[in-house]
Design a protein with these regions (language model features):
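Conserved active-site alpha-helix within GNAT-family acetyltransferase domains
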Residues: 100, 124-141
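Active-site/acyl-donor-binding loops of N-acyltransferases
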Residues: 135-153
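Acetyl-CoA-dependent GNAT
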Residues: 33-84, 90-92, 143, 153
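Conserved beta-strand-loop-alpha-helix junction that forms the acyl-donor binding cleft
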Residues: 90, 109, 119-130
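Conserved acetyl-CoA pyrophosphate-binding loop and the N-cap/start of the following alpha-helix
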Residues: 93, 97-105
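A short, well-structured alpha-helix characteristic of acyl/acetyltransferase catalytic modules
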Residues: 1-42
């Protein structure tokens, strides 16, 4: 079982580690992402203050052990006029069902905020396409850059 946890700014070290881990970020064509402490305050203000329908961010925590295992988010893409979601599970914690549970919880949270559909852009060949399809998403479009999936909430 998992739960979402809203981190304090001082706890963004977990996100920093997650984004710096090559195996965890192997799904992203950009590879690892630099997230130095000097960027935390601005990022925190943008993603977690104030809360509303434009952005949502939480750590994924194993509710039995209390261990942080990943992150879940959505944001409103005002260019395409859609909500984009993101689930990142630490590589060392994959294969235990955390991603699927987090995806379901993220969709419930989005629905509770009045969001009627949610999307994700996934790199072609990424195993998570199957995860999204198993959890009610459908492929909207696909090219050599991204597979766009969508779920009605």
């Amino acid at each position: 079982m998992i739960e979402f946890y809203r981190p304090y700014m001082e706890e963004l070290g977990f996100r920093q580690q997650l984004l710096a881990d090559g195996e965890t970020m192997s799904f992203d064509p950009r590879g690892t992402i630099d997230f130095p402490e000097k960027k935390w305050a601005e990022w925190y203000r943008r993603w977690l203050e104030p809360e509303g329908g434009e952005r949502f961010y939480r750590y994924i925590r194993d509710s039995c052990s209390g261990e942080l295992v990943g992150e879940a988010a959505w944001y409103f893409d005002d260019v395409r006029n859609i909500y984009i979601c993101s689930i990142i599970t630490a590589a060392a914690r994959r294969g235990r069902g955390y991603g699927g549970e987090a995806l379901e919880l993220l969709c419930r949270e989005a629905r509770a905020m009045g969001i009627s559909e949610i999307y994700d852009d996934i790199a072609p060949g990424n195993r998570s396409v199957g995860l999204f399809l198993r959890h009610g998403f459908a492929v909207v479009s696909s090219d050599d850059v991204a597979v766009l999936v969508k779920r009605q909430l």
